[in-house]
Amino acid sequence: GGGMLGLFNAAMRPGIELVLDLLHAREACAWADVVITGEGSIDGQTPYGKVPSGIARLAKSQGKPVIAIGGKVTHDPNVTAALNEAGIVATFSIAPGPAALPELLTGTKRNVEATCAAIASLLSVARECSSRPHQ
C-alpha cells in the first residue's frame, strides 16, 4: 500500500468503499425504500467495520432504513443501540430454530429466502397500514 501511495499517486480507501463502487450500491440505494443486508453473525463488531455497517452508512446518508439478517443475531441492548446509531433499524436471524451448524449451513439459501419473504410481508403490511386513513 505505502509504495503505491508514493510511486503512483494512489489513495488509501476502506475496502467497503471499493465494494460499494463496484456494485453500484449508491445508485441502487437511491431508488430503494429499504435496504436489506446481512452476514453470518450480527454482533457487537457489526457496527464497527463489518460490511453491514458500511452499507448502513451509505443508506443512512440517503435517508434509507436498513434491515440486517444473519445466521446468528446478538440481542444485547448495547449492540442494538449501536446498530440503530449506525442506521440498522431491525435485525432478523435466518435460523429457523436450534440446530447444529452443519444443518444450518446446508439450509442457508432456503432460510435466507424464507426470512426475506417474511420481511417483505411485514413491509407490505406496514405500507398498507400507513396508507389507511386513521379514525
Predicted regions and their residues:
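N-terminal loops that bind phosphate or other acidic moieties
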Residues: G1-Q135
